[in-house]
Amino acid sequence: MAGRGKGKTAGKKAVSRSAKAGLQFPVGRIARYLKKGKYAERIGAGAPVYLAAVLEYLTAEVLELAGNAARDNKKNRIVPRHIQLAIRNDEELGKLLGDVTIASGGVLPNIHAVLLPKKSKGGKGEEAA
């Protein structure tokens, strides 16, 4: 039985790097993209894991805020408009994605202060006098 493995380890099930890191995003695919993209001559073993974790965190953050925006509008489905509202209303995400255009996102509702009707300074007492 030479060349058949070590017996106990031969029956082990393969565990993905995503599962080892406790991530949903594919670490192997991100590693492949990093290598294929020629960003550097060599890619460290931890780089794709870290990048997958960062991407997963940012995605979860945007999805949570977009879900809140959808719920505020009494909708069950997240559409690009909800993603736009979520990103633009959040200070840090707005800064990170300031130059990004979201298709079918629309614009933030905003009326310039000069265009708003003037507030009357006096109450009902001045009108009678």
Swiss-Prot record:
Top-rank taxon, per record: Eukaryota
Disulfide bonds: none
Organism: Volvox carteri
PANTHER family associated with the record: HISTONE H2A
Pfam families associated with the record: Histone (PF00125), Histone_H2A_C (PF16211)
Keywords: Chromosome, DNA-binding, Nucleosome core, Nucleus
Function: Core component of nucleosome. Nucleosomes wrap and compact DNA into chromatin, limiting DNA accessibility to the cellular machineries which require DNA as a template. Histones thereby play a central role in transcription regulation, DNA repair, DNA replication and chromosomal stability. DNA accessibility is regulated via a complex set of post-translational modifications of histones, also called histone code, and nucleosome remodeling.
Signal peptide: none
Protein name: Histone H2A-III
SMART domains membership: H2A
